[in-house]
């Protein structure tokens, strides 16, 4: 399935190198490089283009199959563990569907935050933290989860906190879910710039990844 999207300005498809807190206060000025975390609360998020495409929406149904998610990640990181990529693709589709989150958005955000599973920053592979939750700088690398499913579920739940005011459908595993204030503050990916991540181009970077996914 292919979506027709409006083009956005090209930005390099690299992991964000700006530390953030996870929904609970201003983002501290720390020295890069570290992977971006999940959502410090900033009073006035930067304005981004307001495309009407549902592809930009955090909530909704993703259009890509697990096979396409797998091929997309491996195209960008041929050295990734293919078995783990297959597992993560299926988990993102399952967990996103359970909460009504757009699985395409969640998956490309994971690719962005982890450098297509290269990691290399404060968050490491064995942490099963696929979105930088709680990663704010040296000495605070972020949250650890016992397995891939729990880590993916925490990511999906944190996205839902930004994209919707609805309650969770599954048991809460994201300890920072209640720290996102106000709930539903970012119905689309552009609202994540300056809130989820310090990077003011964060939403555009995710849009570039979505464009690539849908090619």
Where on the chain are the PLM-derived regions?
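Catalytic cores of secreted/periplasmic lytic hydrolases that degrade extracellular macromolecules
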Residues: 2, 19-215
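Bacterial N-terminal signal peptides that target proteins for export
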Residues: 1-8
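Bacterial N-terminal signal peptides
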Residues: 8-16
